[in-house]
Regions:
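Metal-ion/cofactor- or nucleotide/acyl-coenzyme-handling active-site neighborhoods
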Residues: 2-35, 39-54, 67, 71-391
Length: 391
């Protein structure tokens, strides 16, 4: 019996030990934890139906606060320089209504109209008599004749022998005609025109008021001169009326070579003395220039022909003379406005300076007469840049 108890007790001990070991083994083996589920995607609720103006834009994250700005001691703070203003945009001025109307007339295709040209030339010759009366000569103004100043009709001048000897022996234009003539005005429109070569290509070139033809102007106005007018006011302003040194005047006259110099000695009584001094100076210095005097009777005829109340400008006088003397007349530098008709830029009064003209001439009215002749194909006005090969 005892041995059986011992065996039973031993078996129980053995089972107990195995149970402890098994329990320990099971407790050390842990199952892997289940995977952590990812959070569901953020779902933005759609706006309820009927919500007008509601946005489907997701709300932005709150801004990350910036660090506080560095505080600089007030003594070191310098104000920022003001911004440099940008230049204003270039504004091209528009042409005024008057210039628009003028250019509408001028822009028509120009063509020489032989019949119109011949009729007008004949009318001018029969009315103004430039061939025989444009210049005071010994042929048309004898000793004892009365010269009536065209600007002072109440002060006639009796021709003495001394005066008579200063007159041209005969009219330099009698029985002379030229095929092409350039009449060069002094308008600022000639600046940068490149018209010099075309001007000089004419057989006879007329210039006004001792206009400069030095090298700096050669490209635009040329230098050929067959006839030049000399207003006594220029002789007084530039050369002190030739009462002092006369050499500067003669140095200035060299540029005109052997041209005729047309002096309005009998327009006003004050013109006579200074015009005579100019003539005597050129004789004393043996100048090749031939001074002659404009005939006031011819100027009165011109004024009546053009029906202008104001005194005619030198430009219109010379254009009129050219229309009698020349088959083809081309005008340059004739533009009475202060804005370029094609480039829309401001113009100087003259191509060589910006001295304003006096109000004794009716420049726009004169230009209107010349523009009408341009439209009729009687003469041609050149505006803008010239093309020498087109002539």
């Amino acid at each position: 019996m005892l041995p059986s108890l011992k065996m039973l007790f031993s078996l129980m001990i053995t089972l107990l030990i195995f149970g402890i070991l098994f329990t320990t083994l099971i407790s050390d083996v842990r199952p892997a934890p289940p995977p952590v589920p990812l959070p569901p995607a953020l779902k933005i609720p759609s706006p309820p139906k009927g919500c007008k103006g509601c946005s489907d834009v997701r709300p932005s994250a709150p801004p990350v606060p910036l660090p506080p700005a560095l505080k600089i001691p007030s003594s070191d703070v310098r104000p920022a320089p003001p911004p440099v203003p940008l230049p204003p945009a270039l504004k091209i001025p528009s042409r005024g209504p008057l210039i628009e109307k003028v250019m509408a007339r001028y822009s028509q295709t120009w063509k020489k109209q032989e019949e119109n040209s011949t009729k007008f030339r004949d009318l001018l010759r029969s009315t103004c008599h430039g061939f025989t009366k444009a210049v005071v000569s010994q042929d048309n103004t004898p000793v004892g004749a009365q010269i009536v100043y065209d600007g002072e009709k109440r002060k006639p001048l009796t021709v003495t022998s001394a005066f008579f000897n200063t007159f041209a022996k005969r009219n330099p234009f009698s029985n002379k005609t030229w095929d092409t003539c350039s009449v060069v005005g002094n308008g600022g429109i000639l600046s940068n025109s490149n018209c010099g070569e075309m001007i000089d290509s004419a057989q006879f070139v007329i210039r006004c008021n001792l206009s400069p033809v030095e090298n700096s102007f050669l490209k635009d106005v040329g230098n050929k001169t067959n006839l030049v007018t000399a207003n006594p006011s220029i002789l007084i302003k530039k050369f002190r009326g030739l009462q002092d040194r006369r050499r500067p005047f003669m140095e200035s006259m060299r540029r005109y070579n052997d041209s005729l110099m047309l002096l309005p000695a009998f327009s006003y009584s004050g013109n006579t003395e200074v015009s005579l001094r100019a003539l005597y100076t050129m004789e004393d210095f043996e100048s090749p220039i031939r001074p002659v005097f404009l005939n006031p009777e011819y100027l009165l005829n011109l004024r009546s022909f053009w029906r202008l109340n104001k005194r005619l400008s030198s430009g219109l006088m010379m254009a009129s003379l050219a229309l009698e003397l020349c088959t083809n007349v081309h005008l340059y530098g004739f533009w009475p406005f202060d804005q370029h008709p094609l480039l829309h830029q401001p113009l100087k009064n003259h191509y060589y300076d910006n001295v304003q003209s006096t109000k004794i001439h009716a420049m726009p009215a004169e230009f209107d007469h010349l523009l009408r002749l341009h439209e009729q194909g009687v003469l041609k006005i050149h505006l803008g840049k010239c093309r020498p090969s087109s002539r």
